Amino acid sequence: MKQMSSYPVRISRSADIRKTLSATAGIYRKAVDFFISVCMEEWDTVSACKGQTGKVNAVEAFTVKTSKRKTVPYDFGKDFYKFPSYLRRAAIAQAVGKVSSYKSNMKNWEASDPRTRGRIPGYPCAGYVYPAMYRNNMFVRTGTYTASI
C-alpha cells in the first residue's frame, strides 16, 4: 500500500499565498479549540446524540445564533464573525472526535491498574489540524496542475 502525505509539499512559491494559508489554518485551529472547550463542558448532552451529524447539530445549538435561537450559551459568532458554515461544521466534527478520544482514553486510564498505567491523558487541543480546502469556493482551478486561492 502506498501512503501519501501533503504536509511536506510546498503549495506555492508566493509568500502571500503561504501567509494566507497559514493564517487560515491558524484561525481554523482556534475555532477547533473553541469547540473543544464547548464539547468538554457539554459532553453529557453531546455524547447522548446519535451519529456525527447529531453531535455536530448539538454543538451548533450551543454556539450558533439563528433567527429562532437569539441567544446561545457560547457565542461562536462573537470571535469568529462570518466563519464559513462548512468550515465551522468541520471544526466541530474535529473537536467532537478529539474530545471523544480523550474521554475514552481517560476512562481506560482510570480503569487500568494504578501501578502499571502510564501518565494521565492530556487535555485535548487542536494541535496541527488543517481545514480541508476542497470546497468549490475555496479555490479556482486555473489549469491541470494549478489553482488560485
Regions found by a protein language model. Name each.
Residues 1-149:
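Nucleic-acid substrate recognition interfaces
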